[in-house]
UniProtKB/Swiss-Prot annotation:
It comes from the Eukaryota. The keyword Cell membrane applies. It comes from Pongo abelii. Residues 1-12, 483-509 are cytoplasmic. This is Monocarboxylate transporter 9. SUPFAM superfamilies: MFS general substrate transporter. Belongs to the major facilitator superfamily. Monocarboxylate porter (TC 2.A.1.13) family. It is a multi-pass membrane protein. One of its GO terms (molecular function) is carnitine transmembrane transporter activity.
Length: 509
């Protein structure tokens, strides 16, 4: 169905509002899971590493399943996926209130809620991109702050609900709030031409002659497949001879579709043999597409900046994600009294993440700022801030570090810019999908690793030194790969003839 031109406004602003609210509702609880993490530790008595799997799965599963989420949205549309995912998120949260043990939470909260969030994120971003072209950056920036605002509000909301209604009541109420996603999804009107008539089914006898005849030698493979997919609507008569039971096909002659079907078994065998041949060609084509995908993936990793970027995003999520999950428990382990809490530390991380997304996004638009180096700077500063957490023994210092970490976590808003500069716009979708997979892997592994360090040492010191080292290492690897001096050194060495699979982008970022 033909789509309208992106209106860059109008109903698009309704899409922005409901997408913002959708991300607010679905990501509020998973991102503020640190409040629930403390309650689960007390309720189930499991180790910190095992309990941390609940929150890490909720954040990582959606990213790990990003290719499946994209396929669902492209196949069914943003509105149905949003409504279905709203049921998943709400149902997973409500189901978690009846969890008898931590393993049940792995499924109900970690997998069900996490997968629902991944589907919702893909749906909101996709439909926003359809409605906006010139103002796409602004629209995406606005909806992306929904998750950060959700983190800010849900951290305080969940703490209050736990105090008044207990852990189970909190999850039931938060799940009920998530049902509002269904209303948001109903407003996600598909962008399609209102005056575009629905396609009519054509009777076989009314098909044009060009679909009744097929000359194998005059068509390329893609045309063969297209005609095969339209299927045959009429009998074809072949000039062939039967020799030793094998058919030797020269060409196909057109036969009027109104002619009655022949009863000769030879014609039936010819048709079966012909369609079998084209099915084999279709299978070969699909295999060729798979080989091309693998070849493009290998080509991406031949780009040293992209290879460094994938290592950096993996290490960043292993080390940078745990604070949003564990900071409340860090304060409790540092003997910070609850009376000193002016605002939950997770709320500070959330509001500063929203500020960081906006300010870093604005800085990335300045031509005199190198986006890749800006991203590297956020990684290095974040690594240093993580290493400073063990020295924070008061609410004020923990709040200050939480604000710094939250602001730097806003570098997610410039990550697509960095990816585009690294591989080019034509490779963005492929490259971004790979990077998001490794980001999900890091999100899933980071908090349990930090929790295991605590279970091993009974202190968060080594755990956050490890987190800071991971982020620092990722930043320095990316910095070294992007330095123009590396290209200068490589130019002095004999190099093979350039191919389409080699990219020199570091000096152009």
């Amino acid at each position: 169905m033909e789509l309208k031109k992106s209106p860059d406004g109008g109903w698009g602003w309704v899409i922005v509002f409901v997408s913002f609210f959708t991300q607010f509702l679905c990501y509020g609880s998973p991102l503020a899971v640190g409040v629930l993490y403390i309650e689960w530790l007390d309720a189930f008595g499991e180790g910190k590493g095992k309990t941390a799997w609940v929150g890490s799965l909720a954040s990582g599963v959606g990213l790990l399943a990003s290719p499946v989420c994209s396929l669902c949205v492209s196949s069914f549309g943003a509105r149905p996926v949003t409504i279905f995912s709203g049921f998943m998120v709400a149902g997973g949260l409500m189901l978690s209130s009846f969890a008898p043990n931590i393993y049940f939470l792995f499924f109900s909260y970690g997998i069900v809620v996490g997968l629902g969030c991944g589907l919702l994120y893909t749906a909101t971003v996709t439909i926003t991109c359809l409605y906006f072209d010139d103002r796409r950056g602004l629209a995406l920036g606005l909806i992306s702050t929904g998750s950060s605002v959700g983190l800010f509000i849900y951290a305080a909301l969940q703490r209050m609900l736990v105090e008044f209604y207990g852990l189970d009541g909190c999850l039931l109420i938060v799940g009920a709030l998530a049902l509002n996603i269904l209303a948001c999804g109903s407003l996600m009107r598909p962008l399609q031409s209102s005056d575009c008539p629905l396609p009519k089914k054509i009777a076989p006898e009314d098909l044009p002659d060009k679909y009744s005849i097929y000359n194998e030698k005059g068509k390329n493979l893609e045309e063969n497949i297209n005609i095969l997919e339209k299927s045959y609507s009429s009998e074809e008569k072949c000039r062939t001879t039967l020799a030793n039971g094998d058919w030797k096909q020269d060409s196909l002659l057109h036969k009027n579709p109104t002619v009655t079907h022949t009863k000769e078994p030879e014609t039936y065998k010819k048709k079966v043999a012909e369609q079998t041949y084209f099915c084999k060609q279709l299978a070969k084509r699909k295999w060729q597409l798979y080989k091309n995908y693998c070849g493009e993936t290998v080509a991406l990793f031949k780009n040293k900046v992209f290879s460094a970027l994938f290592i950096a995003i993996l290490l960043f999520d292993i080390g940078g994600f745990p604070p949003s999950l564990l900071m409340e428990d860090v304060a409790r382990s540092s003997n910070v009294k609850e009376e000193e809490f002016i605002m939950p530390l997770i709320s500070i991380i959330g509001i500063m993440t929203a500020v960081g997304k906006l300010l870093l996004g604005i800085l990335a638009d300045f031509k005199w700022i190198n986006t890749l180096y800006l991203y590297v700077a956020t990684l290095i500063i974040m690594g240093l801030a993580l290493c400073a957490i063990p020295f924070a023994k008061s609410y004020v210092t923990l709040a200050l570090l939480s604000g710094i970490l939250g602001f730097l976590t806003g570098n997610w808003s410039i990550f697509p810019y960095v990816t585009t500069k690294t591989v080019g716009i034509e490779k963005l979708a492929h490259a971004y999908g790979i990077l998001m997979f490794f980001a999900g892997l890091g999100n899933s592994l980071g908090p349990p690793i930090v929790g295991w360090f605590y279970d091993w040492t009974q202190t968060y010191e080594i755990a956050f030194y490890f987190s800071g080292f991971c982020v620092l290492l990722g930043g320095f690897i990316l910095l070294l790969a992007a330095l123009p001096s590396w290209d200068t050194c490589n130019k002095q060495l004999p190099k093979p003839a350039p191919t389409t699979f080699l990219y020199k982008v570091a000096s152009n970022v």
